[in-house]
Regions:
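Generic low-complexity segments that are intrinsically disordered, proline-rich and/or Lys/Arg-biased
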Residues: 3-6, 10, 47, 206, ...
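Loop-centered beta-sheet repeat module
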Residues: 21-74, 78
Length: 243
């Protein structure tokens, strides 16, 4: 009841089957993340609330990884980043990389934040510090080199504040960082040759690299969107990188 202790009277107590790690919220639904399966508690009043076990076998590894983002709650599981909602749940990173690559980000100590409908993660592992950004709408994943020990999403000012070396910083407000994008490997059934390429960007210069059968055939700082010729030759595997 409003303004009453959450578990009083005793009839209001809900019991889950695993130790609780943390909580999330979706509208009027409370999301309970545990060391086993997650649960939904739905209802407008404690006396009429209903608890439902989620349809996904993914434990929550880190309380600090839990982020409530509109119609879903995201958290770190052993297999990847999970998006959880009453309408359906899934490991959203499953198609991006495998379980072992995910483990390299240290999900047990992952810090999660929200910014512009994106999940921003920060990690500190033996191989180094850094983080990643998962865009829910575009279904894309990008790594970054920024590390933070804490974060706060200020809805009033539409800003994300992070803690770096005991100092407060505003996300996406400082000097622009370099960005590297590399395509997947395009494999053709027969060797192919391409005549030219064009790089269209919001700003220049853009360092462009093109690989044919694993060998770099172009490495050039492009300053405009002019057509440029490719070196002659056939290749089965093609990759493209922009920086």
């Amino acid at each position: 009841e409003p303004f009453r202790p959450f578990a009083w009277p005793i009839q209001y107590i809900q019991t889950v089957g695993y130790p609780i790690v943390g909580l999330g919220v979706i509208d009027t639904t409370l999301v309970v993340l545990t060391q086993g399966r997650p649960y939904f508690i739905q209802g407008s009043h404690p006396s009429s609330s209903i608890m439902v076990e989620a349809d996904i076998n993914q434990a929550c590894l880190s309380k600090r990884s839990i982020v409530s983002m509109g119609n879903a709650v995201f958290y770190a599981s052993p297999d990847g980043l999970v998006g959880l909602s009453p309408g359906g749940s899934a490991v959203v990173t499953e198609s991006l990389f495998d379980k072992f690559t995910w483990q390299d980000t240290g999900p047990a100590d992952l810090l999660g934040c929200m910014y512009e409908n994106k999940y921003v993660g920060f990690y500190n592992v033996s191989s180094g510090i850094g983080g990643f950004i998962y865009d829910m709408k575009a279904k894309t994943w990008n790594f970054h080199t920024v590390y933070a020990t804490g974060g706060y999403n200020d809805l009033k000012n539409d800003a994300l504040y992070i803690i770096q070396s005991n100092e407060l910083s505003k996300w996406d407000s400082g000097t622009a960082l370099s960005y590297i994008w590399k395509s997947k490997k395009f494999t053709f059934p027969e060797p192919k040759s391409f005549a030219c390429y064009r790089v269209q960007a919001e700003g220049y210069p853009v360092t462009t690299k093109i690989y044919r059968d694993g060998v770099s055939i172009v490495s050039l700082s492009v300053t405009d969107d002019s057509l440029r010729r490719l070196p002659a030759g056939l290749g089965t595997d093609w990759e493209f990188q922009l920086e």
